[in-house]
């Protein structure tokens, strides 16, 4: 049996218990399942109240039901939504009835979205945008995901693909109808001009790809420094909750502690690390090793010090700010050594809050510069970048092979069009689909 001959069902709303739960069904037998549960079919796309019953006539729950006949539905199939009370007992009873119904089965993760993709309701870039929207933690991530979900990248790729196919058709028509075998200049010149313009557009998108991808992944800030310098206190201040143990005893933090922050809409992961020092304790040694490793791979290191920063360790080329802590404990302004290798210096008291505003403002400014103008970023995933890179390379080869024969030019354009088709998920991507849609939750 083909998977689409089966009707799937899943809880599409949040964790139970809840005030309302939404159960979604999709497939050829969704309507029959609704008829069985509600006793009658509601009008399409009209909110209808119904008492759901099991096959023995026992009430399950009072519900609001919606019926979306194919193809005018989210998945392109017959779709039913059951809005019921978010009780674990109600859901268990309903799922028991559905599971015992022939040709109905529980949905796999992402299966509703995959069916929508396979039925042409959205392309692969829009499906990835939906996944990004589900996992968005900040407003800027939400806006970026919505742009992709609405087809900003997909529409542009479709237009590029159509223009490449048109250019290839012009060249192939010239080959087919030319007595000498050479494409007439009046056909070749406009085709190559169009290819050159497309190449410039695609290269511009590739040049800006890092911004959107960085916004999706977020900025990593590591808090490092010697033991008892106030790292965990700063971590708690930034998180605005107790996420790290604060103790006057040195070496309290042995492992990495991560917290996700939203700084002016920018996603930031802050990592508290073990105090860096020489030690004979093997557990603490491992903590120090991990601290140095994360600092080397961070986007920014905040090096905390009670003193003048003489003990600063800089890992690689990672930007480093010196943050002098506990300024409320010394009455005089402390000088900073000129050879600390820190690009910026701040003085704070995490306990009193002095200096925290300036540090936060600086972090927001760093994030703004790090992410750049994300409005122009379209590529959020490595898969998308690779497909566009393959397209641009094929277009460049088509321009470079003009003197070797128009057949080679047309072949390179065909390769470019295929790469864009893979980006949209329309050709040669079957192996990717399971990987992509497994990232979705069940019920989506």
UniProtKB/Swiss-Prot annotation:
One of the record's GO molecular function terms: GTP binding
Residues at which GTP binds: 228-233, 247-253, 272-275, 349-351
PANTHER family the record matches: TRNA MODIFICATION GTPASE GTPBP3, TRNA MODIFICATION GTPASE GTPBP3, MITOCHONDRIAL
Keywords (A to Z) from UniProt: Cytoplasm, GTP-binding, Hydrolase, Magnesium, Metal-binding, Nucleotide-binding, Potassium, tRNA processing
SUPFAM superfamilies the UniProt entry points to: P-loop containing nucleoside triphosphate hydrolases, TrmE connector domain
Localization: Cytoplasm
Keyword Ribosomal protein found: no
Binding site for Mg(2+): 232, 253
A matching Pfam family: MnmE_helical
Co-factor requirement: K(+)
Domain TrmE-type G, first and last residues per copy: 218-368
NCBIfam families: mnmE_trmE_thdF, PRK05291.1-3, small_GTP
UniProt enzyme class: hydrolase
Superkingdom per UniProt: Bacteria
Cofactor note: Binds 1 potassium ion per subunit.
EC numbers on record: 3.6.-.-
Stated role: Exhibits a very high intrinsic GTPase hydrolysis rate. Involved in the addition of a carboxymethylaminomethyl (cmnm) group at the wobble position (U34) of certain tRNAs, forming tRNA-cmnm(5)s(2)U34.
Entry protein name: tRNA modification GTPase MnmE
BP term (GO), one: tRNA methylation
Assembly mode: Homodimer. Heterotetramer of two MnmE and two MnmG subunits.
Family: Belongs to the TRAFAC class TrmE-Era-EngA-EngB-Septin-like GTPase superfamily. TrmE GTPase family.
Binding site for (6S)-5-formyl-5,6,7,8-tetrahydrofolate: 24, 81, 121, 444
Keyword field contains Nucleotide-binding: yes
Gene Ontology annotations for the cellular component aspect, listed alphabetically: cytoplasm
């Amino acid at each position: 049996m083909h998977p689409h001959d089966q009707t799937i069902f899943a809880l599409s709303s949040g964790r139970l218990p809840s005030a309302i739960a939404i159960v979604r069904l999709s497939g050829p037998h969704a309507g029959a399942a609704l008829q069985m549960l509600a006793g009658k079919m509601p009008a399409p796309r009209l909110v209808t109240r119904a008492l759901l019953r099991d096959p023995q006539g026992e009430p399950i729950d009072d519900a609001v039901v919606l019926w979306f006949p194919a193809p005018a539905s989210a998945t392109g199939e017959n779709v039913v939504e059951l809005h019921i009370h978010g009780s674990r007992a109600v859901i268990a009873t309903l799922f028991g009835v559905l599971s015992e119904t022939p040709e109905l089965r529980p949905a796999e993760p992402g299966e509703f979205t995959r069916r929508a993709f396979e039925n042409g309701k959205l392309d692969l870039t829009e499906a990835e945008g939906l996944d990004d929207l589900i996992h968005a933690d900040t407003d800027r991530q939400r806006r970026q995901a919505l742009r992709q979900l609405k087809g900003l990248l997909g529409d542009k790729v479709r237009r590029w693909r159509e223009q490449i196919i048109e250019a290839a058709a012009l060249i192939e028509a010239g080959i087919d109808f030319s007595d000498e075998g050479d494409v007439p200049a009046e056909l070749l010149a406009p085709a190559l001009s169009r290819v050159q313009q497309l190449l410039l557009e695609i290269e511009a998108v590739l040049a800006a790809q890092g911004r959107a991808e960085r916004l999706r992944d977020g900025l990593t800030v590591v808090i490092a420094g010697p033991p008892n310098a106030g790292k965990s206190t700063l971590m708690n201040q930034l998180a605005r909750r107790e996420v790290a143990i604060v103790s006057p005893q040195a070496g309290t933090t042995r492992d990495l502690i991560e917290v996700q922050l939203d700084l002016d809409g920018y996603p930031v992961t802050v990592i508290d690390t073990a105090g860096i020092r020489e030690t004979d304790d093997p557990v603490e040694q491992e903590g120090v090793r991990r601290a140095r490793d994360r600092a080397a791979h961070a986007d920014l290191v905040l090096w905390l010090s009670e003193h003048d920063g003489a003990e600063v360790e800089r890992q690689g080329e990672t930007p480093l700010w010196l943050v002098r802590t506990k300024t409320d404990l010394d009455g005089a302004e402390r000088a900073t050594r000129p050879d600390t290798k820190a690009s910026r210096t701040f003085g704070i008291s995490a306990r009193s809050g002095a200096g925290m505003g300036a540090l936060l403002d600086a972090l927001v400014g760093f994030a703004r510069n790090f992410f750049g103008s994300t409005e122009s970023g379209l590529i959020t995933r490595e898969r998308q970048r690779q497909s566009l890179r393959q397209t641009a390379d094929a277009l460049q080869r088509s321009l470079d092979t003009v003197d070797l024969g128009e057949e080679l030019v047309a072949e390179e354009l065909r390769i470019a069009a295929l790469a864009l088709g893979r980006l949209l998920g329309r050709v040669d991507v079957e192996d990717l689909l399971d990987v992509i849609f497994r990232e979705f939750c069940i019920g989506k």
